[in-house]
């Protein structure tokens, strides 16, 4: 019954925003609100003031916790999986964002993850898997370099350098997939399963690119404009903004139905120089 209800009406879209350091409830609960009630006449606190125009459609759920997943800053995969998690520990099961993406009406990309970090970390590790998973031992990578993500989503409808880089990357990935698939057949049975996940990753990327090519005309209406934030970011927040633009465009265009945004990418990160926050940690 739940599945039937969720598949009717307009398109459903879900966004998970993960902040691994936690936050004070006072940053989202209006002053004087002690029990459940309408937000129509409430004044939202400064940190969520941007949601003021939408507060009559807004629900704030207070009191949820994940202390069973980790006693520290981040539970990594456990935060969305509901199980114990910690740094360097692979997922022991699927996460709720992935499971919900399967229940919603099918899209070209079932689930998109983007991660925001310091500019240095995003450049040296443009993809990382710490928060989402499709199953035990099956992490889902999040994208942190907006240039790479733009090529993945909109490279097929681009021109100039972006198009050339997209075509070159596509050719390389196709060749790697073919080579990897052929080499894996000679591995022992136990290793073949693990190696198969590696090959499947290339198949998923190449398959997504082919599916996106079939709706190129539609995607042109939603592709963000590439500007200096992509190629010459002054602060990490320039890339954060570009990643958010890409994530929202993927939702509105119908590329995906579920977006997971990892602030800090599941790790300990707190410097936002573009917002005037220079220090990191317990300051």
Which role does the model predict for each range below?
Residues 1-283:
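Ligand-binding pockets and gating/stacking loops
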